[in-house]
Amino acid sequence: MNTNDFDFELPEELIAQTPLEKRDSSKLLIIDHRQKTMVDSHFDHIIDQLNPGDALVMNNTRVLPARLYGEKPDTHGHVELLLLKNTQGDQWEVLAKPAKRLKVGSQVNFGDGRLKATIIDELEHGGRIVEFSYDGIFLEVLESLGEMPLPPYIHEKLEDAERYQTVYAKENGSAAAPTAGLHFTTDLLKKIEAKGVHLVYLTLHVGLGTFRPVSVDNLDEHDMHSEFYSLSEEAAQTLRDVKQAGGRVVAVGTTSIRTLETIGGKFQGDIQADSGWTNIFIKPGYQFKVVDAFSTNFHLPKSTLVMLVSAFAGRDFVLEAYRHAVDEKYRFFSFGDAMFVN
């Protein structure tokens, strides 16, 4: 299959720049790929798509305020670092701008020197490995100095940083939010649980690769980014019990899907506690092993995420649903509306 097979027309005004006032007031397009049906709804009605005994699986990663602005003490030149992943101890892989000024041994100061970074290795495409030095607790220093790394297609300033976190965000480590979860409120989750649905949490730390365009025509040549995931024994046991009792595993977002399917692939369809790195690329032809249904936002044309949804529901039907969403003025991408896929 070709990358262009997943292209569609998207007017720029449909790219949501700000979150809605109420998280669960977004629109929800409910699609059933077997019946070939589409129903326009609202997100708080997602509870009607869930049955007692189902498991709703959510990614509890928390977005780090990973964008840092500093200066080189020798030249006072301005530098921007974007934290990508913690490699070990106080060492991080970062994206640096302007990278050409930052050679091994270069120093950058942030916040009057409260946080210092030393370049210890150079990677391609502006990547660097840095070692941080600071007083106190790193995450607290980062919270006070860093900014939320919003996606490149969002140009408005975010008034409340918590709106780019899910209400259940807990495990620090992402460079981007698992946006399908942004629609849930604490109240809605309580109602879902009261219906007899099991709430299950896993962790996948979302990397910036999630925004990286597919640069090859032939999908088989695409090099998928790696992300760290973790599923606890308690969560795995709940999911096994749900499957055994005939319930469905309903994933919230593509990050939950990728975690569950990575584990399903590793353990021949069984669900086991596990952690590690995944670069799973789910595209048409893939056989799903764990996930029975899911919610997700509307994704970028030609992205690996549109390909994932197409693997589950069929490319032609998914693109038809996307055309419907465009016609009905659904809001797209991170702060946009959602789709529920049966």
From Swiss-Prot:
Main location: cytoplasm
Cysteines engaged in disulfide bonds, as pairs: none
GO molecular function: S-adenosylmethionine:tRNA ribosyltransferase-isomerase activity
Pathway where this protein functions: tRNA modification; tRNA-queuosine biosynthesis
Keywords, comma-separated and alphabetical: Cytoplasm, Queuosine biosynthesis, S-adenosyl-L-methionine, Transferase
Pfam families listed in its UniProt record: Queuosine_synth
Its EC number(s): 2.4.99.17
InterPro entries listed in its UniProt record: QueA, QueA_dom1, QueA_dom2, QueA_sf
A GO-annotated cellular component: cytoplasm
Compartments it resides in: Cytoplasm
Reactions performed catalytically: 7-aminomethyl-7-carbaguanosine(34) in tRNA + S-adenosyl-L-methionine = epoxyqueuosine(34) in tRNA + adenine + L-methionine + 2 H(+)
Single biological process term from Gene Ontology: queuosine biosynthetic process
Described function: Transfers and isomerizes the ribose moiety from AdoMet to the 7-aminomethyl group of 7-deazaguanine (preQ1-tRNA) to give epoxyqueuosine (oQ-tRNA).
Family to which the UniProt record says this protein belongs: Belongs to the QueA family.
Quaternary structure note: Monomer.
HAMAP family to which the protein is assigned, alphabetical: QueA
PANTHER family: S-ADENOSYLMETHIONINE:TRNA RIBOSYLTRANSFERASE-ISOMERASE
The protein, known as: S-adenosylmethionine:tRNA ribosyltransferase-isomerase
Gene: queA
